[in-house]
């Protein structure tokens, strides 16, 4: 099992690399919504294009709304990165892709005051010969910042299952030991009874029980 657990991540990476090389696709993965104070937090925003070969002018706008407040612009991508004046100034980092399908940003040194609702607006104007359609997508990320990292539910369940398995194996081994001990004890008792019965036979019967050998 340990060897299998070590090989599984490697096999997954190889499979992902093979899929990305042979079948380049865009997957819209949702962003994480919990961060720990003092760490960096990636706000993931992915807006896939159905026709990647079509050229498009892309504009990205990131907004932040504190609890009980209003939305205000904190980051903008328009022909290049542009961090606007806001309480996040100096703590935002572009983390997107060259094709602008991944337009994520990273918040550095997250604070408790960074909790709130983040909005990612992606506006695209496609350049066709006959017309120039305009498409806009929006992603909402409710972020909650905590002082300490909470326990992962999956790891807790895995730990509980591990302890249950250890208890089960211990009980099974204990039962097997008792079964083997009783089996050996019964075999020894049977051997002792046979020996006692043989010793209890009179010597005359022992001599008579000897079969004469004809010459």
From Swiss-Prot:
<dbReference type="GO" id="GO:0061337">
    <property type="term" value="P:cardiac conduction"/>
</dbReference>
<dbReference type="GO" id="GO:0086015">
    <property type="term" value="P:SA node cell action potential"/>
</dbReference>
<dbReference type="GO" id="GO:0017080">
    <property type="term" value="F:sodium channel regulator activity"/>
</dbReference>
<comment type="function">
    <text>Regulatory subunit of multiple voltage-gated sodium (Nav) channels directly mediating the depolarization of excitable membranes. Navs, also called VGSCs (voltage-gated sodium channels) or VDSCs (voltage-dependent sodium channels), operate by switching between closed and open conformations depending on the voltage difference across the membrane. In the open conformation they allow Na(+) ions to selectively pass through the pore, along their electrochemical gradient.</text>
</comment>
<dbReference type="GO" id="GO:0010460">
    <property type="term" value="P:positive regulation of heart rate"/>
</dbReference>
<dbReference type="InterPro" id="IPR003599">
    <property type="entry name" value="Ig_sub"/>
</dbReference>
<keyword id="KW-0325">Glycoprotein</keyword>
<dbReference type="InterPro" id="IPR036179">
    <property type="entry name" value="Ig-like_dom_sf"/>
</dbReference>
<dbReference type="InterPro" id="IPR013783">
    <property type="entry name" value="Ig-like_fold"/>
</dbReference>
<feature type="transmembrane region" description="Helical">
    <location>
        <begin position="157"/>
        <end position="178"/>
    </location>
</feature>
<comment type="subunit">
    <text>A voltage-gated sodium (Nav) channel consists of an ion-conducting pore-forming alpha subunit functional on its own that is regulated by one or more beta subunits. Forms homodimers and homotrimers. SCN3B is non-covalently associated with alpha subunits and induces the formation of alpha subunit oligomers, including trimers. Interacts with SCN5A/Nav1.5; regulatory subunit of SCN5A/Nav1.5. Interacts with SCN7A/Nav2.1; probable regulatory subunit of SCN7A/Nav2.1. Interacts with SCN10A; regulatory subunit of SCN10A/Nav1.8.</text>
</comment>
<dbReference type="GO" id="GO:0060371">
    <property type="term" value="P:regulation of atrial cardiac muscle cell membrane depolarization"/>
</dbReference>
<dbReference type="GO" id="GO:0010765">
    <property type="term" value="P:positive regulation of sodium ion transport"/>
</dbReference>
<keyword id="KW-0894">Sodium channel</keyword>
<feature type="signal peptide">
    <location>
        <begin position="1"/>
        <end position="24"/>
    </location>
</feature>
<feature type="topological domain" description="Cytoplasmic">
    <location>
        <begin position="179"/>
        <end position="215"/>
    </location>
</feature>
<feature type="glycosylation site" description="N-linked (GlcNAc...) asparagine">
    <location>
        <position position="109"/>
    </location>
</feature>
<feature type="glycosylation site" description="N-linked (GlcNAc...) asparagine">
    <location>
        <position position="95"/>
    </location>
</feature>
<keyword id="KW-0739">Sodium transport</keyword>
<dbReference type="InterPro" id="IPR027098">
    <property type="entry name" value="Na_channel_b1/b3"/>
</dbReference>
<dbReference type="GO" id="GO:0030018">
    <property type="term" value="C:Z disc"/>
</dbReference>
<dbReference type="InterPro" id="IPR013106">
    <property type="entry name" value="Ig_V-set"/>
</dbReference>
<keyword id="KW-0915">Sodium</keyword>
<dbReference type="Pfam" id="PF07686">
    <property type="entry name" value="V-set"/>
</dbReference>
<feature type="domain" description="Ig-like C2-type">
    <location>
        <begin position="25"/>
        <end position="138"/>
    </location>
</feature>
<keyword id="KW-0407">Ion channel</keyword>
<feature type="disulfide bond">
    <location>
        <begin position="45"/>
        <end position="120"/>
    </location>
</feature>
<dbReference type="GO" id="GO:0007399">
    <property type="term" value="P:nervous system development"/>
</dbReference>
<dbReference type="InterPro" id="IPR007110">
    <property type="entry name" value="Ig-like_dom"/>
</dbReference>
<keyword id="KW-0812">Transmembrane</keyword>
<dbReference type="GO" id="GO:0086006">
    <property type="term" value="F:voltage-gated sodium channel activity involved in cardiac muscle cell action potential"/>
</dbReference>
<protein>
    <recommendedName>
        <fullName>Sodium channel regulatory subunit beta-3</fullName>
    </recommendedName>
</protein>
<keyword id="KW-0406">Ion transport</keyword>
<keyword id="KW-0813">Transport</keyword>
<dbReference type="GO" id="GO:0043231">
    <property type="term" value="C:intracellular membrane-bounded organelle"/>
</dbReference>
<dbReference type="GO" id="GO:0086091">
    <property type="term" value="P:regulation of heart rate by cardiac conduction"/>
</dbReference>
<feature type="glycosylation site" description="N-linked (GlcNAc...) asparagine">
    <location>
        <position position="113"/>
    </location>
</feature>
<dbReference type="GO" id="GO:0060373">
    <property type="term" value="P:regulation of ventricular cardiac muscle cell membrane depolarization"/>
</dbReference>
<dbReference type="GO" id="GO:0086005">
    <property type="term" value="P:ventricular cardiac muscle cell action potential"/>
</dbReference>
<keyword id="KW-0472">Membrane</keyword>
<dbReference type="GO" id="GO:0044325">
    <property type="term" value="F:transmembrane transporter binding"/>
</dbReference>
<keyword id="KW-0393">Immunoglobulin domain</keyword>
